Amino acid sequence: IPECDVVIASGDMDTLQLVDDKHVQVFTLKKGINDTVLYDEEAVKQRYGFGPEFLPDFKGLKGDPSDNIKGVKGIGDKTATELIKNFGTIENIYRDLETRHSKLKTSFTPRVVELLEKGKEDAEFSKILGTIRRDAPITFSFPEKTWGEGVEMSKAEALFQELEFRQLAERLRGAV
């Protein structure tokens, strides 16, 4: 498939992990039907404090009841965000915990360290559950024709004139 720009229109915020500034953005509702947001990498960073690539780790730490993902019991949004800002991935968090001079043990409370130690399996499994797989074996090809090749301009213009769609008629002429 040639590289193309993709806008995912979804109310499921899990799709934000697919955002990348090269080609993928997510269009979603913010509040109500008229307040919308188009997320690129910067917008994801502004909302969460880290990039879209860390959203599965965030979900692995804090869980997500709406998706029945457990996470680490006792770890909420704020702590999960700070852990990701400091260590990035769940793998890095647990790698640090196993070192002799753990940065985590000196930067976070003993309670957080204990929760992470007890919740390691839940964190790792929750991350797996919260990750959208990108390796599904699919085949896709773009059609050979462009969409405008099938438009019968005379019929479209007659309809637009009948319905008094002047601007739409002009836009159609410009697009075909």
Regions found by a protein language model. Name each.
Residues I1-P137, E170:
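Extended two-metal-dependent nuclease catalytic cores across DNA- and RNA-processing enzymes
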Residues L115-K118, I128-V176:
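Low-complexity, acidic/Ser/Thr- and charged residue-rich accessory regions of DNA metabolism proteins
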